[in-house]
A protein has these predicted regions:
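Alpha-helical scaffold domains
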Residues: 2-147
């Protein structure tokens, strides 16, 4: 798989994720209560290495990655999306897509806490009933204070 930035389109990124699949890691993720539906078991350091190949953030590819529903693609989307282009609508869509604590926490700390809506969403979400939406509110609250 060619991994230069010029060829890091959606298909190549997904192929790269799949090439690093680790069934053993997936089994380990289950032990930590991570939802392993549509998961390949690629480590966070490996995903960060892919993200570093982008010299600047890429909102368009981030949207494609998120829409794939692949666990690691969603984590990567949170690493490469441009917080200046993230809308409240996108944040609401993504927070309602959260199906695991790690996606929630990483998306909030990689992306949402860098948006202009972070404070507003921290307040709104912390009063909601949905498990991962409420968690996102609390994760954002913690992130805002430390950034």
């Amino acid at each position: 798989v060619d991994t230069s930035e010029d060829t890091m389109g959606f298909d190549n990124i997904i192929a790269l994720i799949k090439s690093q699949a680790s069934p053993k890691a997936v089994a380990g993720m289950m032990k930590f209560g991570i939802n392993t539906t549509n998961t390949y078991g690629v480590s966070i350091p490996a995903l960060r290495a892919i993200a570093k190949k982008f010299r600047k953030r890429n909102h368009v590819i981030a949207q494609e990655l998120w829409s794939s529903g692949i666990h690691e693609a969603r984590l990567l989307a949170s690493m490469i999306d441009d917080p200046n282009l993230v809308t409240e609508k996108q944040m609401e869509k993504w927070v309602n897509d959260f199906n695991s604590w790690d996606i929630c926490d990483k998306c909030c700390s990689n992306l949402f806490d860098k948006t202009k809506y972070a404070y507003k969403k921290a307040i709104q979400w912390s009063t909601r009933n949905e498990e991962y939406v409420k968690r996102a509110g609390f994760v954002l609250s913690g992130g805002i204070g430390s950034s």
